[in-house]
Structure formats: C-alpha cells, structure tokens
C-alpha cells in the first residue's frame, strides 16, 4: 500500500513540477522536471512502480495539459519508464550507499537516453523522417546538461535523506 501511495505522489509531482518551468519551454527541456519524481519513485518503490509512473506521467500530462506535445511524449514515456525501472532494479541490487545510488542513477540515465533515442528514431521513421546522430546527441545530452547536473546533485541527497528518515516503501 505504501508503494502505491508513494508512486501516486511521484506521479502528482510529475504533473505539477513542469508548471515551474512551463512559461519557458526551453528551461523545462533543460531542467527535465518530470525526470526527478520518476527516478525518485524507482529509488523508493522499485523498478516496477518506477516504470509504471515513468510511462504514465508524460502521456497523462499530455492528455491533461497538452504538454509534452505529441509525438515527443511517446518517446519520453519509454525514456522515463526505463529510468524508473533501471534505477529501481539497480538500487535494490547495489545497496543503499552513496556509490550504489550514483551507479544506479548514472546507469538509468544512460539507458533512458538510449531508449529515448531508439523511440525517437522509430517515431521519425514511421513519419517518413530521419533522426540523425547529431539530433540524438543534442536532445539527449547537450541541451539536457543542466537537468543532468540537477539530477546528479539533488537525487542522491533526497534518497539519502529519505533513507535516514526511515522512509521505505
């Protein structure tokens, strides 16, 4: 029951946090506000719940608010589902130390970006377009550097604080 409640809170954060950057979409695509609650859900609740929240969040947010726009929300759903699943799985396997948190986080971020690129390539291919490697690098890494740094700084602090406070799902 706790996992359901924590997952629902993370999903709600996915819906609300982008409003902080919503007036300037470029800032939202740089700070990646939906990624943090998904990764946190994976850390707290495990890979299955993290994947469910990650896949649902961008699609639900698109249905409710029109953002992120189609077809980007589809590739984002696969990306965030991968984040939640991988970080939850690795965190359970590697333990709760700072090193385990960072390894889980970095591996999840790399896997999620790879899945995002594959999904973008598939979507663009279905629409008769192409998705060159330069677009992948720009979308997955170059424009996302501030969000990547934010995640690498904020999430280990949050996870350690919640673990020390005894928050467990």
Which residue stretches match the model-derived regions?
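Alpha-helical transmembrane segments and their cytosolic interface
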Residues: 1-11, 98, 131-169
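Membrane-helix interface segments
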Residues: 1-4, 47-52, 70, 96-102, ...
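Hydrophobic transmembrane alpha-helices
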Residues: 1-44, 48-49
């Amino acid at each position: 029951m706790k996992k359901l409640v924590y997952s629902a809170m993370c999903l709600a954060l996915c819906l609300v946090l982008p409003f902080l950057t919503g007036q300037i979409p470029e800032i939202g695509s740089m700070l990646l506000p939906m990624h943090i609650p998904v990764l946190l859900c994976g850390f707290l609740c495990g890979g299955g719940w993290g994947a469910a929240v990650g896949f649902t969040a961008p699609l639900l947010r698109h249905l409710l608010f029109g953002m992120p726009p189609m077809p980007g929300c589809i590739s984002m759903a696969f990306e965030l589902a991968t984040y939640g699943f991988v970080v939850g799985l690795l965190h359970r396997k590697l333990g709760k130390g700072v090193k385990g948190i960072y390894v889980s986080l970095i591996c999840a971020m790399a896997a999620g970006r790879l899945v995002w690129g594959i999904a973008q390539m598939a979507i663009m291919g279905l629409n008769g377009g192409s998705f060159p490697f330069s677009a992948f690098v720009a979308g997955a890494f170059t424009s996302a550097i501030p969000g990547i740094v934010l995640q690498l700084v904020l999430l280990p602090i949050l996870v350690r604080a919640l673990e020390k406070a005894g928050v467990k799902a």
